[in-house]
């Protein structure tokens, strides 16, 4: 028997990838990540070393997901990583974050690797501020925070 098979042959059906092993069709499956309706071959890395600002940044200008967050803070006070569901850099203090993560002080940090990515339906944007409030615009110091993401 041949590899691959068609559904509704002759009627414009779809072809599915398979492997013929001893006359039995075993499906071939490609593992891909991404939000519903999107598939790619893996995550894209992103790195940010904080500037002396709120670090308002657009990571991805379309729907996506974050599959890994690694944050490290050398400052003596907590810093706050804020995620926004938008296709451009946030207006910090005006836009409302959808996720706020405290980054522990004094050379501490965290690693978050969810079993399923954190989905953003519009885009992936972020900021890093000195206080937790949604309207906070406290800039962090240069090199306070090192952030790495993996996104799709």
What residue ranges belong to the model's regions?
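Short, surface-exposed beta-strand/strand-loop-strand elements in extracellular ectodomains
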Residues: 75-95
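Residues on the solvent-exposed faces and adjacent turns
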Residues: 73, 85, 128-130
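Exposed aromatic-hydrophobic patches
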Residues: 108-116
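Noncatalytic modules at the cell exterior or secretory-pathway interfaces
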Residues: 67-69, 117-135
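A generic "folded-domain core" signal
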Residues: 86-89, 134-135, 150-152
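Surface-exposed coil/turn segments at beta-strand junctions on protein surfaces, enriched
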Residues: 61-62, 105, 119-121, 140
């Amino acid at each position: 028997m041949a590899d691959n098979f068609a559904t509704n042959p002759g009627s414009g059906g779809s072809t599915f990838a398979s492997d013929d092993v001893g006359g039995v069709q075993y499906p071939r499956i490609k593992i891909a990540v991404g939000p519903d309706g999107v598939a790619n071959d893996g995550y894209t890395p992103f790195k940010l070393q904080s500037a002396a600002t709120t670090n308002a940044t657009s990571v991805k200008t379309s729907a996506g997901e974050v599959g890994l967050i690694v944050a490290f803070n050398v400052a003596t006070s907590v810093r706050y990583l804020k995620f926004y569901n938008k296709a451009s850099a946030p207006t910090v203090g005006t836009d409302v974050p959808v996720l706020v993560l405290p980054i522990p002080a004094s050379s501490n940090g965290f690693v978050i690797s969810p079993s399923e990515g954190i989905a953003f339906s519009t885009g992936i944007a972020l900021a890093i501020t000195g206080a937790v409030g949604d309207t906070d615009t406290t800039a962090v110091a240069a090199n306070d925070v090192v952030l790495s993401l993996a996104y799709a």
